[in-house]
Design a protein with these regions (language model features):
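Non-catalytic, compositionally simple segments
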Residues: 7-10, 50-168
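Conserved RecA-like ASCE ATPase "motif II neighborhood" in helicase/translocase motors
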Residues: 2-60
Length: 168
């Protein structure tokens, strides 16, 4: 693990120090034996040892005010700890706040559409359901041309349900 020690004149206690540790999820013991008050865990659905790592890490996280645990990931099928934690969060069975961000909220995911572009029936349904514009639909077309619709829906899902069902 890499560790950065931080001291700051802005801390109330001038002798206080904080640290930032960076682990990779490649080792099943990553994060074990630590007591983080803030943990940002990235691409959790793709960890090889997700259950073991999270079990060890979660035991060290104090249940106190100011503690934050952020788990974020592209979905990787309806399986694994990320999926289980997501499902439980949606059902209100844990303290996590489920947040899904669809591809079309990203301003960069659009291309100027050609004049006279005609939408397919499926594209018309997407426009209606998600209030998309033709520039977004054209960007989507170009991405689908790169790798197919299945790959697009896996990497750029429109709903959480689609993210978990299409991937993996």
């Amino acid at each position: 693990a890499k560790e950065v020690i931080i001291s700051s004149p802005y801390f109330k206690d001038k002798t206080a120090k904080a640290s930032y540790r960076l682990y990779t999820a490649g080792a099943p013991e990553a994060g074990r034996g630590t007591t983080p008050t803030i943990a940002h865990l990235s691409e959790v659905a793709f960890w090889n040892h997700d259950e073991k790592i999270l079990a060890g890490l979660f035991q060290g996280i104090p249940q106190t005010d100011g503690t934050e645990v952020i788990l974020e990931s592209t979905a990787n099928g309806a399986q694994g700890e990320f999926y289980r934690l997501w499902k439980d969060a949606v059902a209100g069975e844990n303290e996590y706040l489920p947040i899904f961000l669809p591809w079309f909220i990203t301003d960069e995911y659009r291309r100027s559409h050609p004049e006279g572009m005609i939408l397919s029936v499926d594209e018309e349904k997407l426009v209606e359901r998600f209030d998309l514009d033709n520039d977004q639909i054209y960007w989507r077309r170009l991405k689908i041309a790169e790798g197919g619709e299945h790959k697009f829906r896996q990497e750029y899902p429109a709903t959480a349900e689609e993210a978990f069902l299409v991937s993996g």
